């Protein structure tokens, strides 16, 4: 039986869990003002945490699709870095259910050693008594590119027809370290190019969010200001690091970019996240099947 471990950053089940969640992230108790701001951001979502909502539904959808032919049993387990169930919990559950091989999958189409990428290595190190198959850099797959391109084109077309348009693709910035950054930046830029070519978008750029001084740039909001000065008056943002929004991406490429565009009096549309959409789940299931060949 194949067990798929589906990894995401964390999934607080209640607003009451947020302090412990961030204590786990930063390794200490956050200062009260910082924790107050973080908690307020979660309240501003006006929904439960997006990862908390999407990740279990994605697991359920993949398990349903992959078991449709009835040839072999597939189980999908959620695993998180900073909340339960943790990686060890997911591995234990897979063992208890009798899985004989594991496949690791993250919310990140782009492999990042400092992000979801470490999950693949962690599972491979901890599980030595059965095969572990990592699904990395799945952004390269035609079906994945197609579903992103469909969303980018819909957002692009929704801008005013006469606008001079540009698509700004985003991922989380990193501290500048050329050797460490190189594969991340190369994958990001390649993904942006593939999606733009499929969507028929002539003007696009790979930019960054959530950065600090000395991190990879340009920042997406700075890019909007620069490009507005250069004559663009319609912008689409599209996050490529994760198929589901987290709190940072939810606000930074949505609300925050919208505010900049309103200030500059230019048009703005955010490309939809993949989430647990039908085409998204079919595309991911297809890539799992391709990686696992005819065993499924």
Question: Which role fits each region the language model picked out?
Answer:
Residues 1-296:
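Active-site-proximal alpha-helix that buttresses catalytic centers in soluble enzyme cores
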């Amino acid at each position: 039986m194949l067990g798929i471990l589906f990894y995401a950053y964390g999934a607080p089940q209640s607003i009451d869990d947020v302090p412990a969640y961030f204590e786990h992230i930063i390794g200490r108790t956050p200062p009260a003002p910082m924790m107050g701001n973080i908690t307020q951001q979660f309240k501003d979502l006006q929904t439960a945490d997006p990862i908390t909502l999407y990740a279990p539904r994605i697991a359920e959808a993949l398990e349903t699709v992959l078991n449709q032919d009835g040839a072999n049993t597939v189980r999908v387990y959620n695993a998180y870095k900073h909340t339960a169930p943790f990686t060890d919990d997911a591995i234990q559950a897979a063992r208890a259910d009798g899985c004989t091989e594991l496949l690791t999958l993250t919310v990140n189409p782009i492999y990042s050693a400092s992000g979801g990428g470490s999950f693949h290595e962690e599972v491979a190190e901890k599980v030595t008594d059965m095969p572990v198959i990592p699904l990395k850099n799945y952004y390269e797959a035609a079906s994945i590119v197609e579903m992103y391109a469909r969303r980018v084109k819909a957002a692009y077309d929704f801008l005013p027809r006469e606008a001079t348009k540009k698509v700004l693709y985003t991922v989380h910035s990193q501290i500048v370290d050329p050797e460490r950054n190189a594969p991340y930046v190369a994958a990001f830029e390649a993904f942006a190019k593939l999606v733009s070519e499929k969507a028929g978008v002539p003007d696009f750029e790979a930019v960054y969010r959530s950065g600090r001084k000395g991190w990879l740039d340009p920042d997406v909001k700075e890019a909007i200001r620069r490009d507005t000065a250069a004559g663009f008056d319609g912008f689409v943002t599209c996050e490529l690091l994760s198929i589901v929004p987290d709190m940072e991406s939810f606000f930074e490429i949505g609300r925050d970019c919208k505010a900049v565009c309103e200030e500059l009096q230019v048009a703005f549309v955010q490309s939809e996240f993949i989430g647990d959409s039908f085409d998204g789940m079919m595309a991911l299931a297809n890539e799992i099947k391709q990686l696992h060949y005819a065993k499924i």
